[in-house]
From Swiss-Prot:
Function: Scaffolding protein involved in the icosahedric procapsid assembly. Coassembles with the capsid proteins to form the procapsid. The scaffolding protein is found within the capsid as a serie of concentric shells. During DNA packaging, the scaffolding protein molecules are released from the procapsid.
Keywords, sorted A to Z: Coiled coil, Late protein, Viral capsid assembly, Viral release from host cell
Any coiled-coil regions, as ranges: 79-99
Full protein name: Capsid assembly scaffolding protein
Provenance organism: Bacillus phage B103
Name of the gene: 7
Coiled coil listed as a keyword: yes
Family per record: Belongs to the phi29likevirus scaffolding protein family.
Superkingdom of origin: Viruses
Amino acid sequence: MPMERDSHEEILNKLNDPELEHSERTELLQQLRADYGSVLSEFSELTSATEKLRAENSDLIVSNSKLFRQVGITKEKEEEIKQEELSETITIEDLEKQAQL
């Protein structure tokens, strides 16, 4: 995990001190180098995670599109079947007319 912004600023401010000993300066620079490495590592991990999520999102969009099209086709067929059933039903009036004949 990278260091906090305040810690980073504090180290940079210490490095600006002309009276800072060489050993302390070296130690502070090593801390910054280590932090930079962790920042790059975390950035790389987050970038790959983002790419993976984008790919999964694209796959889900395609799957949802196919599913919606399939559901639409199924509903259209169900409506056609219902209309055919309704056209084949006999109403009470039709039965009365047939009984009077």
